[in-house]
Amino acid sequence: MADQALVDQVSAKIDALAAEMIDALSEVVRIPSVNPKYPGQVYDEVVGGEGEVSKAFARHYEGIGAEVDLFAIEPGRENAVGVIKGAGGGRSLIYNGHVDVVPVGDPANWTGGDPFSGKIDGDRVWGRGATDMKSGIMAQTFAARALKECGIALKGDLILEAVAGEEVMDHECGVTATVKRGYTADAAIVSEPSSPPSPLAVVPVSPGLLWFSVTASGKATHSSMRGNSIRAGGDGAAVGVNAIDKGILIFNAMRQLEEEWGLTKKHPLFRPGHFSIHPGVIQGGPHGVMVPFFLSEFLTIDYCVWYSPDDDPEAVKREIETHIHRAAQTDAWLREHPPVVEWKLHWPANTPDADEITAVTVAAHEQAAVGSRFAGAPDIVGFAAVEDATFLTLGGVPAISYGPGDLRVAHADDEYVMIDEVVTACKTFAVAAMDWCGVV
């Protein structure tokens, strides 16, 4: 654990800097930094916001005295890295977060007005990116600043990172680009919002994500022929087959498998039932004529699969494909016209060898949160979603997560972050750096 006198000193400094930190957070929230590759975005109209936010963080890094590297794999999508060199003899640590955000949806649904207002309203800051995750990056940045202003020198290097690309797994443009550029360390803490189930939990693992589609085909004919195609004594498939009926068989099979997972897929750091097979998009109809006057020629369902970090993703794929195949065998048409499965994306689970940095973060939170509503030992949980910690771990840097904010308001209308979470997270980051890197 960090020396208590130093903890008290740096905590007092962060309290003194808190108003400035929240103002700085508001400023970066006001910069729209929607990921230009997010579905539905026109790239050339959106690109550039990520870079502007990274440049803002780079200015903060320069003010701390860090060695700053501002670079882009794609123009307008800069990553900012600030290296605070240690005196030697300590362990190195990366503090990482992503600057890109998801689209705001319909601005009319935001009750506070401008989704990028960055409004400071009593106990919270409003706006897209407040929780996910500009608050976390700012807390890490001001933790480093507080250490410097307290005259606390670390033995190990502290590397601050604000990266692009996370929201669409564009890690080659963001976090992986930093690793390939040589920015590695003995451990990393990604400041993703680590609630739910409780604020400021410590997150040593995350699930994996698979995106796939399954398409059932049909045979178009006039909708008045439905009875002839499905009733006993009719012409059956010879006249037509409604793909929607066939696709629903697959939908029901996936729902059955998901219910089985609720009983069989367990992990000690995840709530029961977390691992799921979510039908997120359904498209179907007659090709080219989206009216209900035909028997539909296709039904495609896109699924988002959340699987346990203990599971082999290839085994998960085989299980899903086997279940679809078995369902198809119950139907004469599907036996002859099997559903087509397409695997579209895989975001691997994060399973780092990170017991030490996890323990350091837990202890740092306990020291930093004294006297706050977050006092005591933090929960240790699995991350609900996926994150860049995966790609740091895959790049040889064991990475966990801890940060202010709540995933239940991330990607939602009226996103916000609680100010006291940002302040306590900032203190935790400062204490963790002292403990992990060592103090001269």
Predicted regions span which residues?
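Catalytic metal-binding/acid-base residues of hydrolase active sites
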Residues: 34, 100, 109, 167, ...
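Metal-dependent amide/peptide-bond hydrolase catalytic core
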Residues: 1-9, 13-16, 69, 74, ...
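Residue-level signal for inorganic ion chemistry
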Residues: 28, 32, 192, 247, ...
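Fold-level recognition of mixed alpha/beta catalytic cores in primary-metabolism enzymes, strongest
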Residues: 130-131, 135-258, 295, 411-427
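A short, acidic/glycine-rich surface segment
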Residues: 102-105, 171-172, 196-201, 262-263, ...
